Amino acid sequence: MNIRGLVLLFVLMTSIFLSGCSNDVAKRPDLKSDYEFEAVINYGDKAFNICCVKESEQWKFTYKSPAQLIDMEVILENENYKISYNGLIQEGLRSEMPDSNICDFVARSLEYITRGKGIEFHKKDDIIIGNGVFDGGDLKVTYDKNRLPKEIIIGKDIEIKFNSFKKV
């Protein structure tokens, strides 16, 4: 998986978690509350573990592949960012990131998706399902009866399953 693919997964995971919805059928977790989660990302024949924890006023996302080929940490705090990717560190103000910067890609994608546009929601029994398109692939998000995310599927290659999702 290339870095853009990894960042897309990061963007999707965080944006699905943080985004608001465009109608009343599916209400997401309240952003005034704090949630943490652990999940497994299956991308083709590769698997990655992801963990999101809230520390003070910042969100900290960590990614590790089982073979330790990828070790990535992203910290978003107010208007600041810090990314550590396999030991390389980059940080600064999100507003001052150059357009070609991968961090800017993360920030712009988060901003776009968190508006809740482009995803349609419907309820089936006690489960809420969101359908849309993300980066050219079909997107399906499944929430449990408590409106917490359980599974995300993008196209035919990417599947994200949450092991835990809890309020802190």
Go through each PLM region and give its residues.
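Bacterial N-terminal signal peptides that target proteins for export
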Residues: 1-7
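Bacterial signal peptide processing site
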Residues: 22-24
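Flexible, processing/modification-adjacent segments and terminal tails
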Residues: 27-31, 35-39, 83-137
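Gly/Pro-enriched, hydrophobic low-complexity segments
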Residues: 60-65, 72, 117-168
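Start-of-domain marker
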Residues: 33, 44-46, 50-53, 58-59
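C-terminal motif of bacterial Sec signal peptides marking the signal peptidase cleavage site
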Residues: 17-20
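An acidic-aromatic
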Residues: 52-108, 112, 158-159
